[in-house]
Regions:
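Conserved active-site and cofactor/substrate-binding residues in soluble primary-metabolism enzymes
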Residues: 31-34, 38, 60, 64, ...
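Accessory alpha-helical/coil subdomains and C-terminal extensions
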Residues: 3-11, 124-200
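Hydrophobic helix-cap positions at the C-terminus of alpha-helices
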Residues: 11, 46, 72, 106-107
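Short Gly/Thr/Asp-enriched flexible loops that form oxyanion-binding sites at enzyme active sites
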Residues: 55-78
Length: 200
């Protein structure tokens, strides 16, 4: 949080924001239910009292977190934006500044929903997958077109499919959800010749 605050100050960023760090900063490939509970605590604490929330996330498991949030917050009181970068903020060719600035603008201006913002693209959080670690277009939605594109010159988002996304949404459960950290999940791929005994 300190490095981001310093960077925004150097860029003369004029938007008022509050920065908080997760309890434990990790490589996102080590993400667990405990980390998700920490993220949820931070979101619950700030969502209703702010214009929006931006979650900065490692790209390896960003899509999983975005999908989880889209299910838990199907109709949030404010926009929730998930973003990250393929290169560190300090790198000269980093995609972090573009993603960070556009995510903050999205949190302040977009209709309330859960989105992924990456490389100037607004993506449906529930359908997002990672496709590259070497290209700025690191994420895509295979079953949905982009919801919008960011115009850096005017600092605004141009919508493509937003009205359809926001129609007929169900109310979000108001109770604060927490994951059972004792649960373990096995990812098992079924292939020809594989039997159910392999999962025993």
């Amino acid at each position: 949080a300190d490095s981001i605050a310093q960077y925004l100050k150097l860029q003369n960023w004029h938007h008022q924001i509050t920065l908080e760090s997760a309890a434990q900063l990790i490589d996102s490939s080590a993400l667990s239910f405990s980390h998700w509970n920490n993220y949820l605590d931070l979101i619950y604490a700030h969502l209703e009292s702010n214009t929006g929330v931006v979650l900065l996330h490692g790209t390896d498991t960003l899509a999983y977190t975005a999908a989880m949030l889209s299910l838990l917050f199907s109709n949030p009181p404010a926009p929730i934006i998930v973003t990250g970068s393929n290169w560190p903020l300090a790198d000269s060719h980093s995609d972090a500044p573009t993603n960070l600035f556009s995510a903050i603008i999205a949190a302040q201006t977009l209709p309330a929903a859960v989105y992924v913002v990456f490389n100037g693209r607004l993506l449906l959080a529930s359908d997002c997958v990672k496709v590259s670690s070497q290209h700025p277009d690191a994420f895509m939605t295979p079953h949905c077109i982009d919801l919008g594109r960011y115009n850096a010159r005017s600092e605004c988002w141009n919508y493509i499919k937003l009205p359809n996304l926001l129609s007929n949404r169900q109310e979000t459960v108001s109770e604060k959800f927490r994951f059972n950290t004792s649960v373990r999940v096995l990812n098992f791929f079924l292939v020809p010749g594989g039997g159910d005994d392999l999962a025993d």
